[in-house]
């Protein structure tokens, strides 16, 4: 399965893996799954770190390098992804989350999230 991790799950996987459920850790560690992170997550981290958000105080350069070194593939943002945001219902206003949902849908990936609002979207989303 192709798994796209949302921003918080990426931060937890890299910095505080105990915050992940056992089933989420199992999915991340399974050789049957391909792991992806979105450029949107890197962008979100950079922006929110610059705003001094305490839950985003991580060096995005190091996080990206660590993800790549640990087998994650980087998912760029395409115009197809941006246009897919327009088709989403107005469930949630966070532009980063909406872009992640659009990317997962457009790419046929399963989006893993801990956010109950994100999990309300139709499509390949799994709340963990």
Functional labels for PLM-detected ranges:
Residues 122-128:
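Active-site regions of enzymes building and remodeling cell-envelope glycoconjugates
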Residues 55-61, 68-114, 128:
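Active-site neighborhoods of divalent-metal-dependent phosphate/nucleic-acid chemistry enzymes
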Residues 14, 40, 77-80:
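Generic beta-structure capping elements
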Residues 45:
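Phosphate/NTP-binding elements of NTP-utilizing enzymes
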Residues 1-37, 51-65, 69, 107, ...:
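Short, well-structured N-terminal submotif of metal-dependent ribonuclease cores
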Residues 9, 41, 81, 100, ...:
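Alpha-helix capping/helix-boundary segments
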């Amino acid at each position: 399965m192709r798994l796209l991790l949302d921003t918080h799950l990426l931060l937890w996987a890299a910095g505080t893996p105990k915050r992940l459920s056992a089933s989420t850790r199992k999915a991340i560690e399974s050789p049957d799954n391909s792991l992806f992170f979105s450029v949107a997550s890197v962008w979100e981290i950079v922006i929110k770190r610059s705003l001094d958000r305490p839950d985003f105080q991580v060096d995005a350069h190091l996080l990206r390098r660590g993800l790549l070194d640990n087998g994650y593939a980087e998912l760029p943002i395409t115009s197809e992804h941006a246009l897919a945001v327009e088709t989403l219902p107005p469930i949630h206003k966070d532009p980063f989350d909406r872009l992640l949902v659009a990317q997962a849908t457009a790419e046929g990936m399963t989006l893993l999230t801990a956010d109950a609002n994100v999990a309300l979207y139709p499509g390949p989303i799994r709340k963990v």
